[in-house]
C-alpha cells in the first residue's frame, strides 16, 4: 500500500463516529498556536469592517432576517486566508474521498463572529434550491470561553438534544441534510469566534 493510502487512525475515528451518530466532536483539532494565528487574522478583518451581517439562504439567494440570525461573517478565500485551517481540512477531504468515496468536490467556509446578544435560531443547513451541502463543520477560535458566556451549539438528535461548549480548537462535524441545530445567545461582551462551513458534493 502506498503512503497515500495508509490508514490514518485519527481520521478513521472521525469517520466512524460520524457514520454511527451523524456527528463527531474533536476537542483539540487545532493547536493553541494555530488558533492564535487564525484568531489574529479574524480580528484583523473584523476590526477593518470587512465582515457583513449574516443572512439566511445560500450565497446566491440571501435574505437578511435578524429575528433568525444576527451574527457577522467573512467568506474565506482559500488562496488568501486561514492557511493552517485549509491545510488540515484538505487533508481530511482527500482521505474521506479515497476511503469512503464521499464525492466531496468543493467547500465553502467563513469566519463567524457572534457579539453579545447574537444567536442563530433552529435550522438545517441545506436549501430547497441547493442540497449540495453534505457535512457541516464548525471550529472554535476563542482563547477563553466560560460556561456562563453562552453561545453553545445545540444539536437536535432524534429524541434528545446535545449542547456543545465552544472551547478553543474544538471542531464539530455533522450531517448537513438531517441534523437541525442552533447557536444559543451569547451572554458576554466577549465575541464568540469560529470558522464555519460545509463540504459539498455535486
For each feature predicted by the language model, list its residue ranges:
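Conserved short histidine dyad/triad with adjacent acidic residue
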Residues: 82, 111-128
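Extracellular structured ligand-interaction cores
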Residues: 23, 106-108, 117, 134-138, ...
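Non-heme Fe(II)/2-oxoglutarate
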Residues: 2-99
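Short, conserved, surface-exposed binding loops centered on an aromatic residue
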Residues: 98-104, 126-131
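Catalytic core of Fe(II)/2-oxoglutarate
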Residues: 128, 133, 142-202
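Short acidic/glycine-rich loop or secondary-structure boundary segments that cap or lie
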Residues: 105, 119-121, 147
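A short coil-to-beta-strand element that immediately follows conserved catalytic motifs
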Residues: 102-110, 149
Amino acid at each position: 500500500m502506498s503512503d497515500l493510502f495508509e490508514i490514518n487512525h485519527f481520521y478513521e475515528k472521525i469517520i466512524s463516529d460520524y457514520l454511527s451518530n451523524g456527528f463527531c466532536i474533536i476537542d483539540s483539532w487545532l493547536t493553541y498556536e494555530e488558533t492564535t494565528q487564525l484568531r489574529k487574522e479574524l480580528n484583523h478583518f473584523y476590526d477593518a469592517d470587512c465582515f457583513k451581517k449574516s443572512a439566511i439562504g445560500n450565497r446566491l439567494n440571501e435574505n437578511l432576517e435578524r429575528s433568525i440570525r444576527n451574527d457577522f461573517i467573512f467568506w474565506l478565500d482559500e488562496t488568501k486566508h486561514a492557511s493552517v485551517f485549509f491545510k488540515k481540512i484538505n487533508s481530511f477531504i482527500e482521505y474521506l474521498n479515497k476511503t469512503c468515496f464521499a464525492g466531496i468536490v468543493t467547500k465553502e467556509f467563513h469566519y463567524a463572529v457572534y457579539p453579545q446578544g447574537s444567536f442563530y435560531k433552529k435550522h438545517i443547513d441545506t436549501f430547497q434550491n441547493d442540497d449540495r451541502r453534505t457535512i457541516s463543520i464548525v471550529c472554535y477560535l476563542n482563547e477563553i470561553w466560560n460556561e456562563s458566556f453562552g453561545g453553545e451549539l445545540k444539536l437536535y438528535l432524534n429524541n434528545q438534544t446535545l449542547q456543545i461548549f465552544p472551547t478553543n480548537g474544538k471542531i464539530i462535524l455533522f450531517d448537513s441534510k438531517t441534523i437541525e441545530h442552533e447557536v444559543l445567545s451569547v451572554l458576554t461582551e466577549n465575541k464568540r469566534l469560529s470558522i464555519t462551513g460545509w463540504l459539498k458534493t455535486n
